[in-house]
Amino acid sequence: MTDTLDLEMDGIITEQRLLERRRAAAEQQRMNQELQDMVNLHQCKRGIFCLVKQAKVTYDSNTTGHRLSYKLPTKRQKLVVMVGEKPITITQHSVETEGCIHSPCQGPEDLCTLIKTLCGLKDLIPFN
């Protein structure tokens, strides 16, 4: 496995940078897998209409806390209602929505809390 690095006279610093990059990449991959598992296991009364199931989510962790970013795709809905003998067509178009939820703590259950917060977000913020 080779990484593109500028070679330095002191191989120790280069080696330390390489090891740190590999460790960070492995940690990010582990967090992404954990997030995907949590999304797949999430169940609530909304089913497939839950924001957790509809949104594309990413999870970031740093020294100041955790952040769950979400992106909801553009949606188009069409409804035909009969009024007497005449059909009325209602078309609704919602734009792409994105945001993030920050948690300043560093507990082991933060990801679960962030997922539950995203699930309940539809009750707090009006989405189309």
Swiss-Prot record:
One Pfam family linked to the record: Adeno_E3_15_3
Function recorded in the entry: Protects virus-infected cells from TNF-induced cytolysis.
Keywords: Early protein, Host-virus interaction, Inhibition of host caspases by virus, Modulation of host cell apoptosis by virus
Species classification: Viruses, Varidnaviria, Bamfordvirae, Preplasmiviricota, Tectiliviricetes
A single BP term in Gene Ontology: symbiont-mediated suppression of host apoptosis
Species, as recorded: Human adenovirus C serotype 5 (HAdV-5)
Name of this protein: Early E3 14.5 kDa protein
UniProt similarity note: Belongs to the adenoviridae E3_15 family.
Keyword DNA-binding annotated: no
